[in-house]
Amino acid sequence: MTNKYTDHLLVLPEDDANRRLVNGFLKNVDVKYRCVQVLHEAGGWHNVLAAMQAAEVVNGLVNHPKRHLLLLIDFDQQAATRLQEYANRLAVLPVAAQNRLYLLGSLETPERLRTACGMHLEDIGHQLASDCPPLPAGSLWSHPHLQHNAPELARLVTQVQPFLFQV
């Protein structure tokens, strides 16, 4: 459980595979894991996007300006469509909430990413944490299954790097 009055990141994973990526991310020694709370799996990308519009989530973001929410989904080879749906849903939220909501995910599924990288999901998450600040060229984030995340990832890292990563 995080302190809602200090900077923190909530993560809403679509499924168990995405949760395992997050768990690997949190095991990286450069990550201040106490600033992160992983929520229960939403059970599908539709449920993840619906959750971002729930009154409890929106009010939590508006009332707690140090809260950030990362939505982690499978894009299932439909990145453009899902990003557009996310943008449409985001547009109707209060600006105070919009600026602290982020959407990332694998182009297909985490399992396909695992196969393409030849690594366990937790190991991929660990490597992604290592590659976050300052996003070096040739990092795992530039993999074809992840490169579509670049604009949102840059926005996320800019916002959370000061409190999420060891200096």
Predicted regions and their residues:
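C-terminal accessory helical subdomains adjacent to catalytic cores in phosphodiester-
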Residues: 1-10, 19-40, 49-167
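Helix N-cap/beta->alpha junction signal
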Residues: 14-15
